[in-house]
Amino acid sequence: MSLGRDRYSLPRTYKRVSHAKDKARPELRKFGWETLGYSESFNLPPFRDSIQRVDGNNLTVEEFRRDFERPRIPVIITGLTDNWAAKDKWTVERLSKKYRNQNFKCGEDDNGNSVRMKMKYYHDYMLNNKDDSPLYIFDSSFAERRKTKKLSEDYSVPKFFEDDLFHYADDKKRPPHRWFVMGPARSGTAIHIDPLGTSAWNSLLQGHKRWVLIPPIAPRDLVKPMAHEKGKHPDEGITWFQTVYKRVRSPSWPKEYAPIECRQGPGETMFVPSGWWHVVINEEYTIAVTHNYCSVENLHLVWPKTVKGRPKLSKHWVKRLTEQRPELLEIIKSASEIPLYDMNESSSDSSSSSSSSDDSSDESDCDDSGRCGGRKRKNDDRSNECPEKMSTTYFQNSLV
């Protein structure tokens, strides 16, 4: 940190924040976290909100599937959080009091270990930092820890996303799929595609988020910052908005890759279909919950990616689906007999800033701390097999 300890209200915040920063972003020890002065100079330009909004109270599950999920069209659904306890409980003041001594993940170190900070220190940091791209709570295990699992009781999965087929896999085997998300202005997520072909929903309880979504057919080298643009924050949402966003808004941007832009507000739930590029930045402090999921509508996309990226999981998963959802086997068979769908990603989101990720080679490499583009996990097995051949034969062998 470039400024002194007197910025914070708690005497230990400076030390705790410095420790977390050294672990999560050691490359910034010499360069500094405030060097670019974004807290004073960064402003999002005016834009036209182009996403469709629908009232969740007047939308049936079948209408959602027909109009949005099946054709893979992003949408904001309103009214889904109206009856959540989180609507009242998830304020900065209440969370910082109730969970003040609980640790939350705000990054990862170079070995892939979680970097955590107590809520009371993060709260102090969030309200008083001037970092260019601040630390961001993106915690995937909050519902599994005894002292924070009550957060999962404050909301319910909306009816449109309840049929998550990964539920049939053991909790210990399935990838991380839900995150408690909290962060200040300028934190966010670098451009990415969600892992394993999953779709996602993100319900915002506090603050505002700016989203840009780009169609799946857009090539990776077009939507990512160029090498000379990456600077000291190559995998941060704020870097994307300072570089690529200017091209996206220019008249020369290809019309077939036309983006959808929106400003998500409290009580709104974003639906991100499988394969869509998306980048998010917080305009102010925000609190949200987000889930990734597999449904009947995107199973044909998720299955081949799971076989390729998580073969052990896929073998376990297909056995469970055979036992409990046998009507889905035809979808899996069809998906196994065709080449993996191409998202134009040749190397496998949530930056010290939102989204999940995986080791699959055709998604952006994002960990569940919000950091994109960094380290990868090793595939669990058979990762060098031809994916097309593997999809067909692996399905057959999994049922033996």
From Swiss-Prot:
Organism: Caenorhabditis elegans
Domain of life: Eukaryota
Keyword Iron: yes
Residue span(s) of domain JmjC: 146-310
GO molecular function list: histone H4R3 demethylase activity; identical protein binding; metal ion binding; P-TEFb complex binding; peptidyl-lysine 5-dioxygenase activity; phosphatidylserine binding
Cofactor notes: Binds 1 Fe(2+) ion per subunit.
Record GO biological process: engulfment of apoptotic cell; peptidyl-lysine hydroxylation to 5-hydroxy-L-lysine; phagocytosis
Polar residues: bias regions: 390-400
Name of the featured protein: Bifunctional arginine demethylase and lysyl-hydroxylase psr-1
Family annotation (SMART domains): JmjC
Binding positions for 2-oxoglutarate per the UniProt entry: N202, T290
Binding-site list for Fe cation: H192, D194, H278
Cofactor(s) annotated in UniProt: Fe(2+)
A GO cellular-component term linked to this record: nucleus
Positions annotated to bind substrate: T189, K209
Subcellular location(s) of the protein: Nucleus
Biased segments, Low complexity type: 346-358
Gene: psr-1
EC number: 1.14.11.-
Other remarks in the entry: Worms lacking psr-1 display more cell corpses than in wild-type animals.
Keywords noted in UniProt: Chromatin regulator, Dioxygenase, Iron, Metal-binding, Nucleus, Oxidoreductase, Transcription, Transcription regulation
Region listing for Disordered, in residue ranges: 342-400
Purpose of the protein: Dioxygenase that can both act as a histone arginine demethylase and a lysyl-hydroxylase.
Subunit structure: Interacts with ced-5 and ced-12.
Main localisation: nucleus
